[in-house]
Amino acid sequence: MNREQIADALRQNQVVAYPTEAVFGLGCNPQSESAVKKLLDLKQRPVEKGLILVAPSLDFFRPFVDFEQINDEQLSRLQGKYERPTTWIVPAKSTTPHFLTGKFDSIAVRLCDHPSVKALCEITGFALTSTSANLTGEPPCRIADEVRSQFGADFPVLDEMVGRAHNPSEIRDLRTNQLFRQG
C-alpha cells in the first residue's frame, strides 16, 4: 500500500505496519482507544506495559506529554540527534489515556526522522503508536513481505524500506538518563 492508503487506514482506526529506523513498526491512531485495543490484542501485549509514540516533531506529542515538567536541559536531550534511535520516557499529562501510558505516569516518545513516519504523521495530523511488527516469538520484520508472512496478505503494510539502524531503539528516562533497553 502507499502512504495515502495507509493514512486512510490509520484515520479509520486500523492497525498498520510501517517502516522505522531499524524494523517495521505496528501503529495506529494513539487517540483511538478501539485502535489501540486492536493493536494490543494483535501483539498479545498487556495494556499495563504502555506504548511508544513516534513523530517527526515535538508538536505531535503535545496532547500527551507534560512539557511543564521538562526543563531546558532535558528538552535539549529530547531533541538531540543520536547515533542510534532513542526513545525517551517523559512525564505524561494527567489527561493522557491509560491505554497509552499503562501503569505509569509517563509515556515513551521518539523523534523519528524516517521519511515514512514523517509523511504519515504529516498526512494524518497525529503521532503514531510504535511497537515492533512481529508476532510473539518471531523476529521483528525488516521487509514488507515478512510483515505479510506473519500477519496475512491483506494486512495494511506501507511498502517502503526501513532505515539503516541495526537494532530497535534505545530506551532511556529523560529525567534520570537511566537506560532501560540498549539500542
UniProtKB/Swiss-Prot annotation:
<dbReference type="GO" id="GO:0003725">
    <property type="term" value="F:double-stranded RNA binding"/>
</dbReference>
<dbReference type="GO" id="GO:0061710">
    <property type="term" value="F:L-threonylcarbamoyladenylate synthase"/>
</dbReference>
<comment type="similarity">
    <text>Belongs to the SUA5 family. TsaC subfamily.</text>
</comment>
<dbReference type="InterPro" id="IPR050156">
    <property type="entry name" value="TC-AMP_synthase_SUA5"/>
</dbReference>
<keyword id="KW-0963">Cytoplasm</keyword>
<dbReference type="GO" id="GO:0005737">
    <property type="term" value="C:cytoplasm"/>
</dbReference>
<keyword id="KW-0808">Transferase</keyword>
<keyword id="KW-0548">Nucleotidyltransferase</keyword>
<dbReference type="InterPro" id="IPR017945">
    <property type="entry name" value="DHBP_synth_RibB-like_a/b_dom"/>
</dbReference>
<protein>
    <recommendedName>
        <fullName>Threonylcarbamoyl-AMP synthase</fullName>
        <ecNumber>2.7.7.87</ecNumber>
    </recommendedName>
</protein>
<dbReference type="InterPro" id="IPR023535">
    <property type="entry name" value="TC-AMP_synthase"/>
</dbReference>
<dbReference type="GO" id="GO:0005524">
    <property type="term" value="F:ATP binding"/>
</dbReference>
<dbReference type="Pfam" id="PF01300">
    <property type="entry name" value="Sua5_yciO_yrdC"/>
</dbReference>
<comment type="function">
    <text>Required for the formation of a threonylcarbamoyl group on adenosine at position 37 (t(6)A37) in tRNAs that read codons beginning with adenine. Catalyzes the conversion of L-threonine, HCO(3)(-)/CO(2) and ATP to give threonylcarbamoyl-AMP (TC-AMP) as the acyladenylate intermediate, with the release of diphosphate.</text>
</comment>
<dbReference type="GO" id="GO:0000049">
    <property type="term" value="F:tRNA binding"/>
</dbReference>
<feature type="domain" description="YrdC-like">
    <location>
        <begin position="1"/>
        <end position="183"/>
    </location>
</feature>
<keyword id="KW-0067">ATP-binding</keyword>
<dbReference type="GO" id="GO:0002949">
    <property type="term" value="P:tRNA threonylcarbamoyladenosine modification"/>
</dbReference>
<keyword id="KW-0819">tRNA processing</keyword>
<dbReference type="GO" id="GO:0006450">
    <property type="term" value="P:regulation of translational fidelity"/>
</dbReference>
<keyword id="KW-0547">Nucleotide-binding</keyword>
<dbReference type="InterPro" id="IPR006070">
    <property type="entry name" value="Sua5-like_dom"/>
</dbReference>
